[in-house]
Amino acid sequence: MFSNFIIYLLCFNSLFLLISTEQGAQKNIFDETNLKHLKLKNRFFRGSVGDNSFKNGKITEEGFKLYDQLSKNEVSNIFTGYTTVSDYNQFENVNVFRIDKDEYIPEFKKLVDLVHKNGANIFMQLVHIGMNTKMKVDTVYGPSSLPLQGLNKMSKEMTKEDILRIENDFAEAALRAKKAGFDGVEIHAAHFYLISEFLNPLSNKRTDE
């Protein structure tokens, strides 16, 4: 299902270390390299940055212009800004990318085709916001039940069923990204979003498995 597709976990700068420590002759940032099957024309990456390019389920004209310019400027690989896999209503910024439904695949395919036409690769960054929300919604999911800053309420400690649901949301989002033609996905596991909350003992007080 995910053959010839790269899945990368954003926790530390492991990917950048990987492509800068090859065996053999010393390389520089302008040299070509490979990441598994993926050919990189140099070691310049555009990191994941929110760019407000998505409105009402569509990529804006300014968004297409931005990615067109980025991919023309000799960047070998572009990471999108964070793209929500589910619970979109918990994002304060309503203009974040969404991949929680199949209906968004055609729009992203247009973006991918544009970037590929200009000779660059593109990865989609996937995220679940977890407790890092400012929105007053009924349920805010987290690894443990903790006070939510500025919301005067507690997060909901996720059940095993909740965990399996969101695991599946990530898997389905990655599959949609692949169908849209992305070269891979970056799983956001930093900056106090859901996955990093599970990795952090300050936010994960669970005693189960």
Feature map (PLM): residue ranges:
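Glycine-rich tight-turn/loop motif centered on a GG-T
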Residues: 90-106, 135-165, 195-209
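Cleavable N-terminal signal peptides of Sec/SRP-targeted secreted and luminal proteins
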Residues: 4-18
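Non-globular sequence segments
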Residues: 113-116, 121, 127-182
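Short beta-strand segments at enzyme active-site cores
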Residues: 78-82, 122-126, 180-194
